[in-house]
Amino acid sequence: MKENFPDMEYHGSTQMTIGNHYEAEYLRKIGFSRVVLPREMTFEEIKKIRENTKIELEIFVSGALCICYSGNCYMSSFIGSRSGNRGMCAQPCRKMYENENGEKGYLLSPKDQLYGYEEIQKLKAIGIESIKVEGRMKDPNYVFETVSYYKNLIDEKN
């Protein structure tokens, strides 16, 4: 790609399943300028990556969480006939299921991710270059309000 598009900036997203500083640094060495880390990472894991590579780091701060590790979901393909690993997740973990006793519920559905003031301050202290808000297929008003919320947190406004 660098040969055909030498001036293009390359970002590695969550589908690359970047789980440590070795993988992030490898991507930097082959020409990537930024990686989007999986939503499941702890602050300590993010900090360790930050301390061991100079690649830009981007972190999701709001949106749907998955029961699978980012980039490794096969449920959508099996249950919804759409690949979650190709950006077409059918969100089978958000569906209602019935167990063998006939009880129904959202057994696989984690709560949505929503970072607040303390989490944003931790990311700032770690030295994260960019935050990411899930906005695909969302109402424009939702996106506006969510982005405004995070802008105020970053700028430390009420």
PLM region descriptions:
Residues 1-18, 36-130, 137-158:
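Active-site pocket-lining/capping segments in soluble small-molecule metabolic enzymes
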Residues 19-23:
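Short, glycine/polar-rich helix-capping loops at beta-to-alpha or helix-loop-helix junctions
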Residues 30-31, 136:
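Hydrophobic alpha-helical bundles that form the membrane domains of multi-pass transporters
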